[in-house]
Regions:
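IMPase-like, lithium-sensitive Mg2+-dependent phosphomonoesterase catalytic core
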Residues: 2-53, 60-62, 73-339
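Alpha-helical scaffold segments that form or flank carboxylate-/histidine-based iron centers
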Residues: 66-69
Length: 339
């Protein structure tokens, strides 16, 4: 079979990007390739999850107070394993772990990056065949090289991210990552076992016709959010609509669709969860970085997500994220509450 050499693989693309910086060490390229390897391994297990004993609970509760799925454990071990045995990551923080882990060895202590990740977002949906995903975020350490990383290396504002991305395991497996140079998407080609560049220079449309929110919690939301949702429902062709509501319950899938097609995703505070439910470091920051690089916006309803300085590893947040024009329309409603 002839391979189309006009399509770059993930490895080739990251090397090409590195060559634009004469003094680059290649550590970030290596780290991204390591994450690509973990994604391939997780993809294999996701695709056969219904055939082997990997569905269901692992009999554990994670730091979030949630039942840990067997596939969560597998995915967490795969991401942690490739980063630990690579040469570019000094330590990791995972949604599934109580605390960060410093890879305290001579090579890792001299690495300049730390990685935060949600190993398997939406795993509660896998037994009904809904797309799920992995989310990751890369920061440059702030402590001196040559020693183990510490908590301050992880408690950084999202604006300090060097790269962020996600993998969606669906009808095809796709890896999307952003640096300050742009957002690019790679689809796993099963014929060669490589992620190949399929969506170069992704731009989030300024407007879309999709809004994503859990309508089941409508009466728990603050009034400005309720008002905006009702406006979305009432949009007509004359007012830029009609809008359609799409909410899968798998954050990676919802945000991937809205990034490509244009739209807005909302996870507001509720009476039960006044601080929000999503994890700032593992979910909000990575997607805020990706969407902003692509031309969109992300806030917690009051301030820009990327400006929030975290005080704990598992800090929660509300999230409003998506197309710039739709976000600005939403903000006009939220500002009434904050005025």
């Amino acid at each position: 079979m002839m391979v189309n050499r006009k399509i770059l693989t993930l490895d080739e693309f990251t090397i090409q990007q590195m060559r634009a910086f004469p003094h680059a060490t290649g550590e970030l390229s290596n780290l991204l390739r390591d994450l690509g390897l973990a994604a391939k391994r997780i993809n294999v297990e996701v695709n056969k999850a219904g055939l082997v004993d990997i569905l269901g609970d692992a009999g554990e509760i994670n730091v979030q107070g949630e039942d840990v799925k067997k596939l969560d454990v597998y995915a967490n071990n795969q991401v942690m394993g490739v980063l630990k045995h690579g040469i570019s990551c000094a330590g990791i923080g995972s949604e599934e772990l109580d605390d960060f882990i410093a890879f305290d060895d001579p090579v890792s202590n001299n690495s300049k990056y730390v990685c935060m990740f949600d190993p398997l977002d939406g795993s509660g949906n896998i037994d009904v065949n809904v797309s799920i995903g992995t989310i990751f975020s890369v920061y440059r350490r702030v402590t001196p090289k040559g020693q183990p990383v510490s908590r301050e290396d992880f408690l950084q504002a999202g604006i300090n991210q060097v790269a962020a991305g996600y993998i969606v395991y669906g009808s095809s497996t796709m890896l999307v990552y952003a640096t300050r140079r742009g957002v690019n998407g790679f689809t796993l080609d099963p014929s060669i076992g490589e992620f190949s560049l399929s969506h170069p220079n992704i731009q989030c449309p300024e407007f879309g016709k999709i809004y994503s929110v859990n309508h089941g919690n409508f009466f728990q939301y603050e009034k400005p959010v309720q008002d905006y949702i009702q406006v979305c429902q009432q949009k007509t062709k004359e007012t830029g609509g009609p809008y359609t509501q799409r909410y899968i319950g798998s954050m990676v899938s919802d945000l991937h669709r809205n990034l490509i097609k244009g739209g807005i995703f909302m996870y507001p505070a509720t009476k039960d969860k006044p601080k929000g439910k999503l994890r700032l470091l593992y979910e909000c920051n990575p997607f805020a970085f990706i969407v902003e690089v692509a031309g969109g916006k992300a806030t917690n309803g009051k301030v820009r997500i990327l400006d929030i300085v975290p005080t704990e590893l598992h800090q929660r947040s509300t999230l409003f994220i998506g197309s710039k024009g739709m976000m600005e329309e939403l903000e006009s409603f939220l500002q009434r509450e904050n005025a």
